[in-house]
Amino acid sequence: MTSITDSAATALQLIASGDAGLLAIVGRSMAVSATACALACGLGLALGAWLGVARFTGRAAVLSLLNTFLAVPSVVVGLVVYLLLSRSGPLGFLGWLFSFKAMVLAQALLVLPVVTALTRQVVEDAEGIHGEQLRSLGARPGLRSLLLAWDERYALLTVLIASFGRAISEVGAVMIVGGNIDGFTRVMTTAIALETSKGDLPLALGLGLILLGVVLLLNVLIALARRWRERSESNEGGREGEREEGRGVPVRTVEAAP
């Protein structure tokens, strides 16, 4: 117990003092995950929104494959990226292996199915509510996907935040393709694994506390996004009611029983 207490105290001192090595690892981890999420979300939002409204032969098979990718272990993604970027692989000429770019690619491939699947579900649910009205106005699938995605932007904001949490907490893929090189490809999760095996518990615990803080912050942002969405929908409903009253249209009528 004393060892744990001492390690926790030292970890808090490292955080409070702004240890250069710790901050470098945290900054690199945030940069990798943010870049990967930006790339994955740019493609995943568009693809998921289209899948939410499109109807084509083989759609069920595509959705089954997409759902399968949700359960792919991160180490398998790391292995695939490693094989692609190795010298004998098809992308070996890029020279990305054991680099920042390799970790971004691995995390982007890991997050892409999550963003696509969640976006598809959100847009498909919205399509079930508003799709018939949009179709009656002549909106084609591409336009409907954009309109519905914009209408569900608060829900999709939650998807983006959740995808960042998935990326920053990943360890297997970045360990394989990044190599955990000190000062170059060492991020929070790989550093925690390494420092724990070396017995440097204060640094590992300090990074763990920061990682927990990041995850907690993401959960708070998700809760705020949901509340923001509920408040926005409530305000829009109130303004619609006021417009109906202004036109002389009763918003709600109650008939008395005879």
Q: Which residue stretches match the model-derived regions?
A:
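Interhelical loop and adjacent transmembrane-helix boundary motif
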Residues: 15-20, 176-216, 220-224, 254, ...
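C-terminal transmembrane helix and the adjacent membrane-cytosol boundary/short C-terminal tail
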Residues: 114-131, 135-138, 142, 146-147, ...
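Cytoplasmic-entry segments and transmembrane alpha-helices of multi-pass inner-membrane transporters
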Residues: 47-81, 117, 251-255
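Transmembrane-helix boundary motif in ABC transporter permease subunits
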Residues: 35-66, 141, 148, 221-227
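Membrane-interfacial helix termini and adjacent extracytoplasmic/periplasmic loops
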Residues: 6, 10-13, 20, 77-109, ...
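Transmembrane alpha-helices
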Residues: 118-119, 141-173
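Periplasmic/extracellular loop-to-transmembrane helix junction in inner-membrane transport proteins
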Residues: 1-38, 53-56, 148, 197-202
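Hydrophobic positions within alpha-helical transmembrane segments of bacterial inner-membrane proteins
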Residues: 33, 37-49, 75, 79, ...
